[in-house]
Regions:
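Short, surface-exposed coil-to-beta transition loops
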Residues: 21, 70-74, 95-100
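Hydrophobic pocket/interface hotspot
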Residues: 33-35, 44, 59-61, 77, ...
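Hydrophobic ligand-binding cavity/cleft-lining segments
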Residues: 3-53
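Beta-strand/loop substructures that line and gate deep hydrophobic ligand-binding cavities in soluble
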Residues: 87-141, 145
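Generic structural detector for well-ordered beta-strands
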Residues: 23-27, 76, 102
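Glycine-rich portal/gate segments that line the openings of hydrophobic small-molecule binding cavities
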Residues: 45-92
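Short, charged helix-to-loop "capping" segments that act as catalytic/coupling loops
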Residues: 23-33, 66-70, 108-110
Length: 145
């Protein structure tokens, strides 16, 4: 099942990190639905993390549960253009890396594609690709897109 949801993966090198770009075509022609999935805490909660909270430009992501393995990360929303893209930087990173999710509508099919940009500081490219593949599969299961 590895990489089934990835249509294209591109690697670039920047800031001593590997920049990865992944495209994933959604089964949706609704910009409102797609925007809700990438531009709101409720939407990100459905596929990025187990719990997402937004307060202004502050975002908190949590994975796992309180009784077992639990990880949280804080981020700052650095760019948000409604119906286009969101970008955040992890607060515990001291470089200019970021996560960006951009939506684009196909002029042929009308379906939306998500373009994800992320950075990896280790050589574990497979781990990051698997993480995003899992996120896209979770998005499909929870939202049907």
């Amino acid at each position: 099942m590895r990489h089934q949801s990835c249509r294209r993966v591109t690697l670039n090198y920047s800031m001593n990190k590997k920049k990865i770009e992944i495209e994933h075509t959604l089964n949706s022609t609704s910009r409102n639905i797609v925007w809700q999935l990438i531009g709101t805490a409720e939407g990100l909660n459905r596929w990025i993390a187990d719990d997402v909270k937004m307060n202004g430009k502050h975002i908190e992501f949590a994975w796992g549960d309180d009784w077992r393995h639990h990880e949280t990360r804080q981020a700052t929303l650095t760019f948000c253009d409604r119906y286009e893209r969101v970008r955040w930087q992890w607060d515990d990173e001291d470089d200019e890396s970021f996560v960006e999710i951009r939506m684009e509508r196909s002029s042929l099919s009308g379906q939306y594609t998500l373009h994800v940009t992320d950075f990896l500081s280790t050589d574990d490219l497979e781990w990051l690709q698997d993480t995003w593949s899992h996120n896209f599969e979770r998005l499909r299961r929870t939202s049907g897109v």
